[in-house]
From Swiss-Prot:
Record has Lipoprotein as a keyword: no
Alphabetically ordered keywords of this record: Carbohydrate metabolism, Glycogen biosynthesis, Glycogen metabolism, Glycosyltransferase, Transferase
N-terminal signal peptide: none
Organism for this UniProt entry: Salmonella paratyphi A (strain ATCC 9150 / SARB42)
Protein name listed in UniProt: 1,4-alpha-glucan branching enzyme GlgB
NCBIfam families: branching_enzym, PRK05402.1, PRK12313.1
GO process terms (BP): glycogen biosynthetic process
Pfam families xref list: Alpha-amylase (PF00128), Alpha-amylase_C (PF02806), CBM_48 (PF02922), GlgB_N (PF22019)
Residues annotated as the enzyme's active site: 405, 458
Disulfide cross-links: none
EC number of this enzyme: 2.4.1.18
Entry-linked CDD domains: AmyAc_Glg_BE, E_set_GBE_prok_N
Length: 728
């Protein structure tokens, strides 16, 4: 036995309790010559081979029957490239020794990762197929600073943690190892002897692909090529652009009718993408596609932030879907969940035996509502992990926007907590200062690194400046969901029309704060689940009135300032709540033309008309783009306003939220002339009563509502009409 190798070291190495395998294994200089040591469980014979000649240059002696081999090459003093000829169960294999390769991570990468400023940590951490010194294999690295030992286990080593213990880079807490022969498509995990001496098997936080539930292994996968956004895609996200978002849960938009199984990414590219384009939407928003173990979370409890879920196919299949959307002129928004993660043992929870990614105190690190864990945003490496993930989706897949979920739960320490269940910040306040700084930093980096890409916030409180710059105290988002508008308008619409006159302010209140943020008007998935009913089913009255109310509401929404968002199924007035385990009710559109077809045609026309007329979208966030013409007619539940573009062109929007037609309804206007009815939600085309104004109306020089000229209209029952000035 080598005098340099202590029996206790060999025992610890074989038992998986040794933290520095490179100090023992591989090739080492000794006084007697070069010494090669290898841990090869179940091997019976090991030779050192010189690759250039194929010549055997020395045999390794088995010093421990459990698989520790050692041998001196007496005539060799300088390190050289070598291979090992290993006999297992009577068969000889030629392998490259992982322990002959030097450190993998560059010093700059190690420094940036430790500092938490590595913009693209996924390029260094995780698993990356590579060639080193002419040998093909895979580089593995994982951050686990408090672990006593970390090994790579996988299909290439029989999931045996003894075979590939990793090197610790103490300056960064990162463990690394190059494994020759490991290749794309193979499964792997990290086996950790944690800070408390317990064995943990963890999936790779940076894995680009993972197994589909219930399996939990990571998969070696190539890093996708960078995607350069086109000028058209960048313009489509701007504040003056028409933005109409079709929100989709990929697993339940449509399913195979024979077995209720999901459509694949490629099938969705062939079916969903052309449908959304035909309907006139400008953006697709996807509920989270990150890998997640529980279908019922809809993806909002992710365990693989860097891995598109395998439910619908591979990473390349997902890229195919995104490319198809872009080719169809659709921008893609991804729901992103940096607010919390599930406590599954294979994932991030107590990753190295300590609360590495989460806060240790449950008053800071545990979500009572969702039984999930909260990221420790104050820890640089954790924040870096999340910021890098944002760039990953945008740069490597061409995602055009991220919609950040549950922002309020991130920025308030007392979110959904009673007194005594939360810890104030350093100033005694309720704000989570670390989360606020994380969001500001993420938005800043997106703006700097991915021109044209944007972020959207689902923020349910009145936190000031969500879409304002950080230097003025804001969070730096581009857009914010207007949940207040959504709640107020739905509360109004569910009322019997006879009572709406007493709640007129629910439709007008939104304009009092409309210009405080850059708003998206969302009718999202959250509004059609958990007993809330479908949007259609919330409307009052008989079937005719329900559909008429819904059409009038959509006409109001598409004209109101703010970008639009509609969850799948609402575009054809699905009658039941959304069920993530089943397809949408496409059968409602089968057979003869019906009310559902009418709503679908209306939404299509709303989208195309909205996109065509700048007055409906160009000045969403400018006071000049909106003006009330009739705001106080609560007795008749009539509201009329003007939308305006930069050139001063106007579109008049008039809504009657009662079932009583309003004939000879006169109101003052700004621009006299001939006005054409460009949309009427009561049209027979949409299965309405076809009450209207014959297509064109002329203004009168009759004073009304403080204006010299006026229009005299028929306002259809439970309807919204749009009029465009087309001449004197």
């Amino acid at each position: 036995m080598s005098s340099r190798i202590d029996r206790d070291v060999i025992n610890a190495l074989i038992a998986g309790h040794f933290a520095d395998p490179f100090s023992v294994l591989g090739m080492h200089q000794t006084q007697a010559g070069l010494e090669v040591r290898a841990l090869l469980p179940d091997a019976t014979d090991v030779w050192v081979i010189e690759p250039k000649t194929g010549r055997k240059v020395g045999k390794l002696e088995c010093l421990d029957a459990r698989g520790f081999f050692c041998g001196v090459l007496p005539r060799r003093k300088n390190f050289f490239r070598y291979q090992l000829a290993v006999t297992w169960h009577g068969q000889q294999n030629l392998i490259d020794d992982p322990y002959r390769f030097g450190p993998l991570m560059q010093e700059m990468d190690a420094w940036l990762l430790s500092e938490g400023t590595h913009l693209r940590p996924y390029e260094t951490l995780g698993a990356h197929a590579d060639t080193m010194d002419g040998v093909t294999g895979t580089r593995f690295s994982v951050w686990a600073p408090n672990a006593r030992r970390v090994s790579v286990v996988g299909q290439f080593n029989y999931w045996d943690g003894r075979r590939h213990p990793m090197r610790l880079r103490k300056e960064s807490g990162i463990w690394e190892l190059f494994i020759p022969g490991a290749h794309n498509g193979q499964l792997y995990k990290f086996e950790l002897l944690d800070a408390n001496g317990n064995l943990r098997i963890k999936a790779d936080p940076y894995a680009f692909e993972a197994q589909m539930r219930p399996e939990t292994a990571s998969m070696i996968c190539g890093l996708p090529e960078k995607v350069t956004p086109s000028e058209e895609r960048q313009k489509a996200n701007q504040f003056d652009a028409p933005i109409s978002i079709y929100e989709v849960h990929l697993g339940s938009w449509r399913r195979h009718t024979d077995n209720n199984f999901w459509l694949s990414y490629r099938e969705l590219a062939d079916q969903l993408v052309p449908y959304a384009k035909w309907m006139g939407f400008t953006h697709l928003e996807l509920l989270p596609v990150n890998e997640h173990p529980f279908d019922g979370s809809w993806g909002y409890q992710p365990t693989g932030l860097y891995a598109p879920t395998r439910r619908f196919g591979t990473l390349d299949d997902f890229r195919y879907f995104i490319n198809a959307a872009h080719a169809a002129g659709l921008n893609v928004i991804l729901d992103w969940v940096p607010g919390h993660f599930p406590s599954d043992e294979f994932s991030l929870a107590e990753f190295d035996g300590t609360h590495l990614y989460e806060h240790s105190d449950p008053r800071e690190g545990y979500h009572q509502d969702w039984n999930t864990l909260i990221y420790n945003y104050g820890r640089r490496e954790v924040s870096n992990y999340l910021v890098g993930n944002a760039l990953y989706w945008m740069e490597r897949f061409g995602i055009d926007a991220l919609r950040v979920d549950a922002v309020a739960s991130m920025i308030y320490r007392d979110y959904s907590r009673k007194e005594g269940e939360w810890i104030p910040n350093e100033f005694g306040g309720r704000e989570n200062l670390e989360a606020i700084e994380f969001l500001r930093n993420t938005n800043r980096i997106i703006g700097e690194q991915v021109p044209g890409a944007v972020s959207m916030a689902e923020e349910s409180t009145d936190f000031s400046g969500v879409t304002r710059p950080p230097e003025t105290g804001g969070l730096g988002f581009w857009y914010k969901w207007n949940l207040g508008w959504m709640h107020d308008t739905l509360d109004y619409m569910k009322l019997d029309p006879v009572y709406r006159q007493y709640h007129h302010d629910k439709l007008t209140f939104g304009m009092l704060y409309n210009h405080t943020e850059n708003f998206v008007l969302p009718l999202s998935h959250d509004e059609v689940v958990h007993g809330k009913k479908s949007i259609l089913d919330r409307m009052p009255g008989d079937a005719w009135q329900k559909f008429a109310n819904l059409r009038a509401y959509y006409g109001w929404m598409w004209a109101f300032p703010g970008k639009k968002l509609l969850f799948m199924g609402n575009e054809f007035a699905q009658g039941r709540e959304w069920n993530h385990d089943a397809s949408l009710d496409w059968h409602l559109l089968e057979g003869g033309d019906n009310w559902h077809h009418g709503v679908q045609r209306l939404v299509r026309d709303l989208n195309h008309t909205y996109r065509h007329h700048k007055a409906l979208h160009e000045l969403d966030f400018d006071a000049y783009g909106f003006e009330w013409l009739v705001v106080d007619d609560n007795e008749r539940s009539v509201l009329i306003f003007v939308r305006r573009d930069k050139a001063g062109n106007e579109i008049i929007v008039a809504s009657n939220f009662t079932p009583v037609p309003r004939h000879d309804y006169r109101f003052g206007i700004n621009q006299p002339g001939r006005w054409r009815e460009i949309l009427n939600t009561d049209s027979m085309h949409y299965h309405g009563s076809n009450t209207g104004n014959g297509g064109v109306v002329h203004s009168d020089e009759i004073e009304s509502h403080g204006r010299q000229h006026s229009l005299n209209l028929t306002l259809p029952p439970l309807a919204t009409i749009w009029l465009m000035r087309e001449g004197e």
